[in-house]
Amino acid sequence: MTDIIATEVAPEAAEALAPVARAPLGDRPIQTVGRRKEAIVRVRIVPGSGRITCNGRELEAYFPSKVHQQLIKDPLVTTEKAETFDVIANLRGGGTTGQAGALRLAIARALIASEPDDRPALKKAGFLTRDARVKESKKYGLKKARKAPQYSKR
């Protein structure tokens, strides 16, 4: 059995190993997806003035709760890009809390796609962690996932 050891890398292989140079953001939108509970959010960020649009409505109209608005804006505020990008979001499924969490994750992922240097700050703040908690399924013989019917001794 003979062993062949390559001492030189072929030119085409060297090109394949070279890091891929990213094109500057320019005017192209960045698209990402965020999920939480049953909610799925598709986000496009484009250079702009800081407007956030959810299903064609302003953020304040779609999420009247100040808590949800703050949650959604946190990644933009952390990276100091709240006035730099416009966010266009398509939200489907779930409730308001799930949609707000999914939107926050999608915005954080989009910010990393536009500026990879922001990753440590977003990671430290916990904006890149996908919350894996979902509704527990109902079991037969029980009224809900864990709630048992009332017990009668006699």
Swiss-Prot record:
Ranges of Basic residues compositional bias? 140-154
Tell whether Ribonucleoprotein is among the UniProt keywords: yes
Where does the source fall among the domains of life?
Bacteria
What InterPro entries does this protein's entry cite? Ribosomal_Su5_D2-typ_SF, Ribosomal_uS9, Ribosomal_uS9_bac/plastid, Ribosomal_uS9_CS, Ribsml_uS5_D2-typ_fold_subgr
Q: Which UniProt keywords apply?
A: Ribonucleoprotein, Ribosomal protein
Q: In the record, what terms sit under GO molecular function?
A: RNA binding; structural constituent of ribosome
GO cellular component terms attached to this protein's record: cytoplasm; small ribosomal subunit
Region entry Disordered, spans = 135-154
Give the GO biological process terms.
translation
| Entries under Pfam families matching the protein | Ribosomal_S9 (PF00380)
| PROSITE patterns registered for this protein in UniProt | RIBOSOMAL_S9
Record family assignment: Belongs to the universal ribosomal protein uS9 family.
Give the protein's recorded name: Small ribosomal subunit protein uS9
> What is the native source organism of this protein?
Salinispora arenicola (strain CNS-205)
